[in-house]
Amino acid sequence: MSPLPDLNKQTPIAVVAAGRLGSSMAIALTEAGYKVAAISSRQMSHREWLASRLKETLVVENAQTAANVASVVFITSPDAMIEDICSEIDWRSHQAVIHCAGVLPLSVLDRARVMGAETAGFHPLQTFPSSDSSTQLKNVSFATESLNPALFYWLWILATDLGGSAFKIESSQRAAYHASAVMACGLLAGLTGLAAEMWKPLGIDRDDALKKLIPLLRATIDALDEKGLPSAITGPYVRGDVETIEAHLEATSDNSEETFEAYRALAGASLHIAKE
């Protein structure tokens, strides 16, 4: 285990392959008083935008150039690119290399580890609709992993300074954790899309239906936050309303096979929670 320099807010940080997540993190880090020394992006238009937002930060195209000026490097590319980006950079001892993926193990950073750097994972449990989503990091949980105690502790404090909180995760737990996140985010959006498509027989298109469903979704999220489970679960399955359930199954079947299967599977799979 290579010794790291003292890690604090003045430790020079680089954010490599900055898209929506990396850009939002770089802005949030700067706003929290951390020293973002460099940030890289392959897109010229995005580099120009970053330069306008991060006036004290070196904005470059090349990831190696960014990594050269930093003691801590966050790789914030899409998951499939992280290992390749890590393998293309010449790392040095006393550096910390951190990926921000939810599902990937620390082993994708083995190239950096072999070259003497310390490695970690730091995944914000959040979605980022744009590159200017730094406020999305507040009140967020960060899945944090590192075999280096000093680096782990620094990331723990960093999560707090960003307005969130950290929790410990191991590489073997990441697939289950990330599947949970996708169920609560991407698949929830997909489920809402299926629900919105059921309004077509009413003469209401999906976009219009979505607007009408949003208040219901917000109320459900509020109930989950305020009352928790199982209290937030409502509907005919909780009441034991068999006739309504039968009508729903017929209606979803008439709509599409996908809608029918989703309704039946979700109702059945969540029944044990509703029964608590």
What name fits each language-model region?
Residues K9-T11, Q95, V140:
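Nucleotide donor/acceptor-binding cores
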Residues M25, M44, E48, S52-L54, ...:
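Rossmann-like NAD(P)(H) cofactor-binding subdomain of soluble oxidoreductases
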Residues M25, W49-R53, R111-A112, G116, ...:
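Internal alpha-helical scaffold of NAD(P)-dependent oxidoreductase catalytic cores
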